[in-house]
UniProtKB/Swiss-Prot annotation:
5-phospho-alpha-D-ribose 1-diphosphate binds at R77, R102, D129, P130, M131, L132, A133, T134, G135, G136, S137, D198. Keywords: Allosteric enzyme, Glycosyltransferase, GTP-binding, Magnesium, Nucleotide-binding, Transferase. GO terms for molecular function: GTP binding; magnesium ion binding; uracil phosphoribosyltransferase activity. GO terms for biological process: UMP salvage; uracil salvage. Allosterically activated by GTP. It comes from Fusobacterium nucleatum subsp. nucleatum (strain ATCC 25586 / DSM 15643 / BCRC 10681 / CIP 101130 / JCM 8532 / KCTC 2640 / LMG 13131 / VPI 4355). This is Uracil phosphoribosyltransferase.
Amino acid sequence: MSVIEINHPLIEHKMTILRSVDTDTKSFRENLNEIAKLMTYEATKNLKLETTEVTTPLMKTQAYTLQDKVALVPILRAGLGMVDGILDLIPTAKVGHIGVYRNEETLEPVYYYCKLPTDIASRKVILVDPMLATGGSAVYAIDYLKEQGVTDIIFMCLVAAPDGIARLLNKHPDVPIYTAKIDQGLNENGYIYPGLGDCGDRIFGTK
């Protein structure tokens, strides 16, 4: 598939706020949700529509409604920070959760929780995690979703490292990646640089 880096002046401006070490928890959380909302516009432009008829105050006319049923799946916990912004645009989406954390020594994903809609296999899944670093968590989550019968997945993140992009495309070339920024790389601890720090900690004020 492909990697789509979404370029937009509002996203650029809000990403600068997120990157700054001086941004407080409230502002970080708000801007993260706003970026997620802006990205959703681009990431959903290929949703399928079906024709219908609507009666306006003047006459009947042809109109369109969403044919695709959407499920939003954040990778816990940082993915939760993108949920509200996306739901603002797709309020009918069902929401599942996949809990994966990264072992800080091996940098490999460790699974701890999953709860998905019962009809997940029939839905277009938007998988979200703000950071695509090594790609381990995203690959694990997509593996799991496909095991549940999901065939239509897109992955959305705010910041992606080349290593994570390469790993995800190698394992799941059918899954498009939408990101606000492609950063330089990973440091010795597996963190994206220049990045924006530990996104989960900055969302929830835990560090």
